[in-house]
Amino acid sequence: MEESQQQSTKFDAPPSPYVPSRVYLAQIYWKKPAIVVLRVLQFVFSLIAFSVMADLLHDVQGSIKSLSYTVAIGVLACAYALAQLSFSLWCVIRGATSSSGVTPLYQYATFICDQMSTYFLISAASATATLIDVSGVCGSNGSGTNLCSRSTASVTFAFLAFLAFSASSVLTGYYLVKCILKA
């Protein structure tokens, strides 16, 4: 009798088609931290970029329009990154991926907003970098060193935020294609 019980426990039921395989789950789980890390990087880099540029704008009395543009884009990018970070954390906490449990409209909106934020950040950073180069803020003799170092730091962090936003755009584009093919 004990042998028959051992034999019956050897043969388990076949895997259910409704339970995801371990390979599929492993493919999903690496994407959860990736999008959260990218959103954290977006928020931190854009926060540093716009706060340094806002301080710089205050020092030059707001006379340079491209600095105002960079601050405005930095604020918008930071707010958007914070909103997306909170949603991504909510998805991770509830156990869903960013591509499941949300509507296709959300996928489209996220992809479009990520793309727009990416383009606006690169344009703002480029405008400020060009202004610094053309206006001679950073002279070859080292004049304006404090202003030069702060503006260079702000542009550097804006470019780092751009890289984080562009990587996030690739990942949200992947989620969007996956959502479209699923439908």
Swiss-Prot record:
The family this protein is said to belong to: Belongs to the Casparian strip membrane proteins (CASP) family.
Keywords, comma-separated and alphabetical: Cell membrane, Glycoprotein, Membrane, Transmembrane, Transmembrane helix
Membrane topology category: Multi-pass membrane protein
Segments crossing the lipid bilayer: 34-54, 73-93, 119-139, 157-177
Side Extracellular, residues: 55-72, 140-156
A UniProt-annotated Pfam family: CASP_dom
Subunit structure: Homodimer and heterodimers.
GO CC, alphabetical: plasma membrane
UniProt source species: Selaginella moellendorffii (Spikemoss)
Residues bearing carbohydrate: N141
Segments in the Cytoplasmic topological domain: 1-33, 94-118, 178-183
Subcellular location(s) of the protein: Cell membrane
Principal place of residence: membrane
Protein name, entry field: CASP-like protein UU1
